[in-house]
Amino acid sequence: THIDRCLSCCSCMTTCPSGVNYMHLIDHARNHVEKTFKRPFLDRMIRTLLSNIIPKPMIFKFVVIMSKFVKPFKFLMPINLKSMLELSPNKIQKKTLKFQNLYRVERKKPTARVALLIGCVQRVVSPQINESTIRILTRHGVEVITMPEIECCGSLNHHLGKEDLAHETFKKNIDFWYEEYLKNGLDAIISNTSGCGTTVKDYGFVLRNDPQFKKKAKKISELTKDVTEFFDENLKLNFKKEERHTKKYNIAYHSACSMQHGQKIHNQPINLLKKTGNNILNIPDGHLCCGS
């Protein structure tokens, strides 16, 4: 039970003076528990539903849409299902950018070519994040490809202890990206979801003993960058005049756990926010998890 309560915030890794990689230890423990312990029926059912719904965007979208019709009856459900229903969004965000596999740079030669991981949950619940990422990248001369075949990074099944399913997803993603890297070239694989980025960056470690995939996995992990990391290292961002507010705002920034502890990225997003001309505030205990 105490393993299930771990949120994988990785704060323990930042705090540990010996540099113990607890993320890998917890993942190993979850896999061991999944293989050796028989959970109660309801627990098994919920975990199976999560494993088969969330990583598949079309199924997940259908479930989210249908959940609003089920919410009035949540009082009849077990506490676990009731909590999940309460957290489900009331509506799906509309897309504002026409979806396509390739987003070219207009009127100039691309300065870089990247693949954007559009994710499973994010492409359904918050598609505007991907759209904004594409707009900023192409505006600054970066050609962007999206690969809809890559539905999920595999982290959900990885954290559920379903190692075989997770590794299957890892390998499928690696094959798609590596083929694109060899055929057309990739300067980076961009993640704008820090949890996904942490997992993809760990592909090389997870598959280090796989003779068929270790080389490819290592390369994919090396190519993977958080979007703020890529901006900070490769682009001189030019904010449009209409994006600069005449009034300065005080913005409190809380870094995602998987970003600051999992990927050791903290200053880059703050530097980007400062370039907007606003005042960025550090919040007390910003290293602690929000609980999500």
Label the predicted regions:
Residues 1, 5-32, 199:
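Iron-sulfur cluster-binding cysteine motifs and their immediate structural context
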Residues 23-292:
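Iron-sulfur cluster-binding electron-transfer modules in prokaryotic oxidoreductases
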